[in-house]
Design a protein with these regions (language model features):
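Terminal amphipathic alpha-helical/low-complexity segments used for targeting or macromolecular assembly
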Residues: 1-59
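Flexible, glycine/small-residue-enriched loop-and-beta-strand segment within the central core
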Residues: 53, 67-77, 82-115
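Short cysteine-rich loop/turn motifs with clustered Cys
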Residues: 59-61, 98
Length: 115
């Protein structure tokens, strides 16, 4: 079983696995691009989020910068989603957020279970 398979199964895994580190670094590059965009660039931000997150319910999504996550593809958000500044998701496991959800500033969601 690979370290990624262990991670996705909710088992203790090695966070310094080469494959996982490569994925983390690729996501960090996208997050850096997202956080560097103008807050007024709604189309640019939406485009990055569509490629980064596992599921977006509709285009009524706002995640204020800065935003941080580990993998992105483990995150699913519903329709009419809003997250305020400094939203952090360590998405080593699935994170599902439903419709009409508003998240305040400085909220963090952690799912990591690594050694």
């Amino acid at each position: 079983m690979t370290e990624k398979e262990k991670m996705l199964a909710g088992m203790v895994y090695s966070a310094v696995d080469k494959q996982l580190l490569e994925e983390l670094n690729a996501v960090k590059e996208e997050i850096h691009r997202y956080n560097a965009l103008s807050p007024a660039d709604n189309d640019g931000r939406l485009g990055i989020l569509k490629g980064l997150l596992g599921h977006i319910g509709d285009e009524e999504i706002i995640i204020n910068q800065p935003f941080y996550c580990d993998y992105g593809k483990q995150i699913s958000v519903g329709r009419r989603f809003f997250a305020n500044f400094h939203f952090t998701v360590l998405d080593e496991a699935k994170v599902t957020i439903g419709d009409d959800c508003f998240i305040g500033p400085n909220v963090s969601i952690y799912t990591a279970c690594h050694s």
